Amino acid sequence: MLSSFPHRKTWRKSKKTVKVTRSYPTFPSLNAWEEFRGLLPVDGEPNPGAGLGVEEGLLCRVVHSPEFNLFLDSVVFESNFIQVKRGRNWRDVYKASNTMALGVTSSVPCLPLPNILLMASVKWHQGQNQTWNRPSIAPNIFLKRILPLRFVELQVCDHYQRILQLRTVTEKIYYLKLHPDHPETVFHFWIRLVQILQKGLSITTKDPRILVTHCLVPKNCSSPSGDSKLVQKKLQASQPSESLIQLMTKGESEALSQIFADLHQQNQLSFRSSRKVETNKNSSGKDSSREDSIPCTCDLRWRASFTYGEWERENPSGLQPLSLLSTLAASTGPQLAPPIGNSI
């Protein structure tokens, strides 16, 4: 028998579970930004510097080996050269199996420019292919020189033959011809390095978060900003002479001591001219004591603006930018090969 009551509908709604996915912005890591800027090699791709034979070579391995254990955190920019001697025609000094590895590095990795020169003689085995990146049989390499770059003069001697001239502080001159297995791009790197060592860099930091608090090139080179012109006008009153400025740009301690002596002498003369001559011994004693107490560093703010920066100092102070050695071969692709004859 059927029921006369209609079927009641349940008014309760069934609960449904809804999954809500929140999307958060993802930021790339620091290494990703560095790879985007071309400063680090992308995973799976070879290091362009190592491919050209200017990084991670034999000289770098010898210096970083447990035998020497030097400059472990610094990049070594190096190339393979053949020592030649000058004459009517360039002639090799040693046999073809003997080459020379020349490189530069930084004693402290935070320095923006290199300050150490490395030289090593390489003796290859008979019939061995002179591949300096990863040779099948390691050649005999002997580290000959570790010199501060401030005591070394490096310049391009023959652009067509790809020959560099290296002069040490003892007047020893080396003529080094770039190994023929190196591409033309590598010699342009050395030309650029010579220009950097002679004139400095206007921009020397890879990381924009690092603030450069010192000048890396002399103010008298070229500066389009108006603030530098005002600084130069203020500095003209305190500059002793043009010869002193030239000595000062060298960054030598003898030149600086001479500058301090000249400044102290000028302060003494100006102080004496402003004071009347007194015959009293006591007053003269007071004057001499005042003259001796004149500080020499009161108007030496202009001194730092004419030096080449902290990279010449053995013990740098303050916040330093990262090393720029790897940026010589940081870019990838065919952009590394500029046309022959054009300077970098």
Curated annotation (Swiss-Prot):
Just give the chief location class.
Golgi
Print the keywords alphabetically.
Golgi apparatus
From what superkingdom does this record's organism come? Answer: Eukaryota
Q: Where in the cell is it found?
A: Golgi apparatus
GO biological process assignments: acrosome assembly; acrosome reaction
PANTHER family cross-referenced by the UniProt entry: GOLGI-ASSOCIATED RAB2 INTERACTOR PROTEIN 1B (PTHR22574:SF13), PTHR22574
**Family the entry assigns:** Belongs to the GARIN family.
Q: Give the function comment from the record.
A: RAB2B effector protein required for accurate acrosome formation and normal male fertility. In complex with RAB2A/RAB2B, seems to suppress excessive vesicle trafficking during acrosome formation.
User: What is this protein identified as?
Assistant: Golgi-associated RAB2 interactor protein 1B
Source species: Homo sapiens (Human)
Task: Give the lineage.
Answer: Eukaryota, Metazoa, Chordata, Craniata, Vertebrata
Q: Which gene encodes it?
A: GARIN1B
